[in-house]
């Protein structure tokens, strides 16, 4: 680690913001900083692998799709690129309520990377350069002032964003064999973890993995279940300019067999985890196939999805089949699956372990607490998934830009968005396994829907400087149309004896007393907006997404209002700031565990304190009472004598 004044270093060049890494977090961070007017440099190991999808070439899914919609609503890029490069789209959980609807897209991995790289390369204020960052340069006040590459080049800056993915101390494993790598064919980064430890950061190890790729020409799809895309297309981006319908490709479903399970059980000792060579925790919600066989021993079979990696590629991704087995055993496992009996493996599956920084060492702005100007985003913070990484990268990029411009840093409260929930969880909870976003992690799912992400966040994106005039005009016009339609639905009435009234009564099995508004009828099951259109009572000038937004707002208005009231009630207490100099060890009414946890995390608000593992409601009440007593004592001490 270099610790010097700015004037004592021979900088090769100087930038406002330097982003270390060119993955999904790095791209969003670099684009955000550059679009906010900062001279930005992205330093990445391999220019040909910008925005690469090293595991599943897919975007979205439960909770993850909400993240992508929110990224787009704030002015990010992931949703646009996905809409331009998808191979297939499906809405998951469609039979359930709108709070958990999830758009998922299979993407063309090479096209996705090519399009995102083009966006990055053509972004004003943004330079990209190939290089491996191995050290940081600190100023006299321990603020970050630059980075050092493997070959000794030094670049100065006002802020650094680390988006290192799985490359920090990365090792990939196939059976008993390993090599230093962040992913297959790419070098690991050594040295940077040592610097972070010297600065006093706690580090740990996590594990993930990716399945084998097989040649589609060697697969028999006729014995598998076809999984086509949805005929009615949906979009991640709220910008109609990127809505281009494309021919969709099929995915397929097969299943593990008793033979698959036998091969795995007999060879568990050959895997890095069960063999005892890797102790790092893997993702709970995306386990290896051997973990599934061990943890769910009573299950006779597991679903395996066969997914294309590209429109012009022979490679198929074997989803749900990641493993660390030796290659010879991997082939046996693959050929035990129906339809893959003669498959040719093009790339073996592997496990990868890497260094990370527990994110309790960050503020919710994603700047580290120990080093001014140093931000972290993506897998370095303990998350798993492209969408989680991109969301963090966007917020880190916004705040790095604001820091160098002398503006106050911004945060998203957990009740505002899935992004806010994600970051709050990371900065508050002690996570010892890769974190994946789930709808169950949000207390406010009905309000944090995919369809209203623009309504919730685009005004913030505009305020922060990432939503241009064209997007803002589109947003305002759309919201005006939806508001007008909701008002029409709440006021237009249908009489009981009208043909439409009779039809709707028969549909619901409930009569109409005199007359009813369209909104009242929409709240009855199973009436939907499509029924109103069929009867000539809908607004055909609205696009289907605007019609749906109006329907959801009306149909769930009571639930939404109750949840909004709950948020407002909780916010009054939970948004109360905690003094930065608060000595938790001196509060005797707190439990010992709570004192230790609060002192370690140093939460910014009462709400953040309440979400720390090991801090119970009684401790929060004790903390609130202590703050009240302290405030009264301060007020009394400040009062004039004799007053």
Curated annotation (Swiss-Prot):
Keywords: Cytoplasm, FAD, Flavoprotein, NAD, tRNA processing. It comes from the Bacteria. FAD binds at residues 21-26. One of its GO terms (cellular component) is cytoplasm. It is found in: Cytoplasm. Gene3D superfamilies: FAD/NAD(P)-binding domain (3.50.50.60), GidA associated domain, C-terminal subdomain (1.10.150.570), tRNA uridine 5-carboxymethylaminomethyl modification enzyme MnmG/GidA (1.10.10.1800). NAD(+) binds at residues 282-296. PROSITE patterns: GIDA_1 (PS01280), GIDA_2 (PS01281). Homodimer. Heterotetramer of two MnmE and two MnmG subunits. This is tRNA uridine 5-carboxymethylaminomethyl modification enzyme MnmG.
């Amino acid at each position: 680690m270099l610790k010097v004044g700015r004037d004592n270093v021979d900088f090769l060049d100087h930038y406002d913001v330097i982003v270390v890494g060119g993955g999904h977090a790095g791209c969003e961070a670099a684009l955000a900083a550059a679009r906010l007017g900062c001279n930005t440099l992205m330093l990445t190991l391999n220019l040909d692998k910008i925005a690469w999808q090293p595991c599943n070439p897919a975007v979205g899914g439960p909770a993850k799709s909400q993240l992508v919609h929110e990224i787009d609503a704030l002015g990010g890029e992931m949703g646009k690129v996905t809409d331009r490069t998808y191979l297939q789209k499906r809405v998951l959980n469609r039979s359930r309520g709108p709070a958990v609807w999830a758009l998922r897209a299979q993407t063309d991995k090479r096209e996705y990377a090519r399009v995102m790289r083009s966006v990055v390369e053509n972004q004003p204020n943004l330079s990209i350069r190939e290089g491996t960052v191995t050290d940081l340069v600190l100023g006299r006040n321990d603020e970050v002032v630059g980075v050092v590459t493997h070959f000794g080049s030094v670049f100065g800056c006002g802020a650094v964003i680390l988006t290192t993915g799985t490359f920090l101390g990365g090792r990939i494993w196939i059976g008993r064999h390993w090599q230093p790598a962040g992913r297959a064919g790419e070098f690991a980064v050594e040295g940077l973890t040592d610097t972070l430890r010297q600065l006093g950061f706690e580090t740990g190890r996590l594990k993930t993995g990716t399945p084998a790729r097989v040649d589609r020409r060697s697969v028999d799809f006729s014995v598998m279940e076809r999984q086509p895309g949805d005929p009615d297309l949906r979009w991640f981006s709220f910008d109609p300019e990127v809505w281009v319908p494309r021919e969709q490709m099929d995915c397929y479903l097969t299943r593990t067999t008793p033979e698959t399970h036998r091969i795995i059980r007999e060879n568990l000792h050959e895997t890095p985890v069960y063999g005892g060579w890797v102790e790092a925790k893997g993702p709970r919600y995306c386990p290896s196939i051997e973990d599934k066989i061990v943890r769910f021993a009573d299950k006779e079979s597991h679903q395996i999805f066969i997914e294309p990696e590209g429109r012009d590629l022979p490679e198929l991704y074997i989803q749900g089949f990641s493993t660390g087995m030796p290659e010879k055993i991997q082939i046996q496992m693959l050929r035990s699956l129906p339809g893959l009996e003669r498959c040719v493996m093009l790339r073996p599956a592997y496990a990868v372990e890497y260094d990370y920084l527990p994110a309790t060492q960050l503020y919710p702005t994603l700047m580290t607490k120990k080093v001014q100007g140093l931000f972290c985003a993506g897998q370095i913070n303990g998350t798993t998934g492209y969408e989680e990484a991109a969301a963090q990268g966007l917020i880190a990029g916004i705040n790095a830009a604001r820091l160098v411009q002398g503006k106050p840093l911004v945060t998203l409260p957990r009740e505002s968005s899935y992004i806010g929930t994600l970051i709050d969880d990371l900065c508050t909870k002690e996570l010892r396994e890769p974190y994946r976003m789930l709808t169950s992690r949000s207390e406010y799912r009905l309000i944090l829907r995919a369809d209203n992400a623009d309504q919730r966040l685009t005004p913030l994106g505009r305020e922060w400087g990432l939503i241009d005039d064209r997007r803002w005009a589109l947003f305002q016009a759309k919201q005006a149309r939806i508001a007008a339609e909701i008002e029409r639905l709440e006021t237009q009435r249908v009489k009981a004896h009208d043909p439409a009234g009779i039809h709707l009564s028969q549909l619901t099995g409930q009569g109409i007393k005199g007359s009813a508004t369209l909104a009242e009828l929409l709240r009855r099951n199973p009436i939907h907006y499509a029924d109103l259109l069929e009867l000539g009572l809908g607004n055909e000038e609205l696009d289907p997404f605007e019609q749906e937004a109006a329907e959801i707002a009306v149909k769930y208005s009571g639930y939404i209002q109750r949840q909004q009231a709950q948020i407002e009630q909780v916010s009054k207490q939970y948004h109360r700031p905690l003094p930065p100099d608060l000595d938790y060890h001196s509060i005797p009414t707190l439990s010992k565990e709570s004192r230790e946890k609060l002192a370690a995390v140093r939460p910014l608000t009462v709400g953040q304190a309440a979400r720390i593992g090991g801090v119970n409601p009684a401790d929060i009440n004790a903390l609130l009472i202590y703050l009240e007593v302290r405030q009264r004592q301060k007020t009394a001490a400040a009062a004039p004598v004799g007053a």
